[in-house]
Amino acid sequence: QVVLAQGISNRDEYRQARRVGRGVVLSRGKRDAVWPVFEEYRTQLSSRKLKEVDDAYRDAVSLLIQDGIESQYSAIVVDETQDLGPQAIRLLRAMVASGKNDLFFVGDGHQRIYNRKKAALSRCGVDIRGRSRKLYINYRTTDEIRKVALAYLEGCEIDDLDDGSDESKRYKSLSRGPVPVTSTFGNLEEASQCLSGWINDLTQGEEGRWSTCVIASSKQLRNFAREQVKQKGFKTEIVEANQSCQVAPDTIYFSTMHRAKGLEFDQVIVLSRQELLKNESDEGRKLLYVAMTRARRESRVIFV
């Protein structure tokens, strides 16, 4: 979050590094004492022909600039910007010549589930002053789902991707639907019974024509839930990280919260450990927000 994110390569740069929010203040003397650890770490990686990803990005930028390599791109479009770190954005900036409509970024600070990658565009050579727009209308999620999902983010820092804060109050959804139901259980057996009952409810009548996904907080919980539902005779499928998802209404899908990003279903059941809400970082709450807002029509939550 400091050395790699800021592209620091020597002791002098580390002395000047920003360490906002780190909790512990390091004096100049302490920074000098700590720096050899980073140097040795990079030396050990290099001896094994390895690099940290952020260092690889930084080296690629140096090659593009110092060697004067002509870009093959006239424009770059970037989605999920909130999950890119500073060095990745600097590389994108270096990959296309500055000009009209050279870079287009789309992102949502509410869905930043990798806090260590937090970046401000203006600090990465991307000037968006007077050129940014906030989109306040939610076309996917019902207003009821949106409000409950936002409640999980209460107290979380939501940024605007450029060192500013985002205001959640101005957002609204165009569609309406049932208020999300939340149930909490003390063991997996009770949670499993609830899950099976909800799956049965959501696959009857008109709801049977809608797509359904169970989104879990871990692979272990996802696999457990899938096995329980499969034993009830339902057709099931796991959405893996390295595959696309072709949604069919006769199949119950199972995904982790991280994999669910970018997906959408008519109906979603979120299955989460209670510890996710107790996480000291904002990441757990943002994962719940992401999971709930994958639903177009209805979202339900089970804590165990």
Question: What does each model-identified segment do?
Answer:
Residues Q1-K30:
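ATP-hydrolysis module of ASCE/P-loop NTPase motor domains
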Residues V2, D59, G109:
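Short acidic/histidine-centered micro-motifs embedded in hydrophobic/aromatic stretches
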Residues S27-K30, P36-L50, S62-S71, A75-V290, ...:
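Conserved helicase motor core of SF1/SF2 NTP-dependent helicases
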